[in-house]
Swiss-Prot record:
It is found in: Cell outer membrane. Keywords: Cell outer membrane, Disulfide bond, Lipoprotein, Membrane, Palmitate, Signal. A lipid is attached at C16 (N-palmitoyl cysteine). It is a lipid-anchor. Residues 1-15 form the signal peptide. Belongs to the MliC family. Type 1 subfamily. It comes from Cronobacter sakazakii (strain ATCC BAA-894). This is Membrane-bound lysozyme inhibitor of C-type lysozyme. InterPro entries: MliC, MliC_sf.
Length: 107
């Protein structure tokens, strides 16, 4: 019985890991923006209410916050604000990426 458990337990744990990764991918959209001729790839995790993207060789993970209009994500230093097919990225309230237009939006 112990030998069977030793063999099956890693398989069961691997299956759980695979399931978690699959659910994570299902809840994540990849959004491609063009910001003043610069590309910006944003991963939107709907379950975590979080966006992730690379800016200046740094991976940023921003959590959804309050917004009067549109959707805003922030970590207290950086902010990603989007409304419709447009977005803006801020660093300490200064615009660092502007005129970001969503490419090939889903309708």
């Amino acid at each position: 019985m112990k030998k069977l458990l030793v063999v099956l337990l890693p398989t069961l744990l691997a299956g759980c890991s695979y399931y978690d990764a699959m659910v994570e991918r299902m809840n994540t959209d990849t959004l491609e923006y063009r910001c003043d001729e610069k590309p910006l790839t944003v991963s939107l995790n709907k379950q975590r209410e979080q966006v992730s993207f690379v800016l200046d060789d740094k991976m940023l993970h921003l959590n959804q916050g309050r917004a009067a209009s549109g959707t805003r994500y922030t970590d207290g230093i950086y902010a990603f604000w989007s409304k419709g097919d447009e977005a803006t990225v801020y660093h300490r309230d200064n615009i660092v990426l502007n005129h970001c237009q969503l490419q090939n939006p889903k309708r």
